[in-house]
Amino acid sequence: MKEQKLIHEGLITESLPNGMFWVRLDNEDLVLGYVSGRIRRSFIRILPGDRVKIEVSRYDSTRGRIIYRLRNKDSND
């Protein structure tokens, strides 16, 4: 059976090398996030200040996979 993942929303606080980011979740936890392969293939740019959805394992809540970048409400995209 497949492991259940918890999906949270958060804010990118710092960019690290190799597609890694520090993400502050809405519940104030700090998680080390890496970019999923689909986002990497689509050349989606993630910058500090962006809101993202992150998938966190229930066994290791200190790291997770960034699966979606949420659109900013004030941008013209």
Swiss-Prot record:
A Gene Ontology term for the protein's cellular component: cytosol
Domain S1-like: 1-71
Compartments in which it is found: Plastid, Chloroplast
Presence of keyword Ribosomal protein: no
Keywords, alphabetical: Chloroplast, Initiation factor, Plastid, Protein biosynthesis, RNA-binding, rRNA-binding
Cysteine pairings via disulfide bonds: none
Chloroplast among keywords: yes
GO molecular function terms attached to this record: ribosome binding; rRNA binding; translation initiation factor activity
Principal place of residence: plastid
Family matches, as InterPro entries: NA-bd_OB-fold, RNA-binding_domain_S1_IF1, S1_domain, TIF_IF1
Pfam families per the UniProt record, alphabetical: eIF-1a (PF01176)
Classification via CDD domains: S1_IF1 (cd04451)
Functional note: One of the essential components for the initiation of protein synthesis. Stabilizes the binding of IF-2 and IF-3 on the 30S subunit to which N-formylmethionyl-tRNA(fMet) subsequently binds. Helps modulate mRNA selection, yielding the 30S pre-initiation complex (PIC). Upon addition of the 50S ribosomal subunit IF-1, IF-2 and IF-3 are released leaving the mature 70S translation initiation complex.
Quaternary structure note: Component of the 30S ribosomal translation pre-initiation complex which assembles on the 30S ribosome in the order IF-2 and IF-3, IF-1 and N-formylmethionyl-tRNA(fMet); mRNA recruitment can occur at any time during PIC assembly.
Entry-linked HAMAP family: IF_1
Family: Belongs to the IF-1 family.
Protein name: Translation initiation factor IF-1, chloroplastic
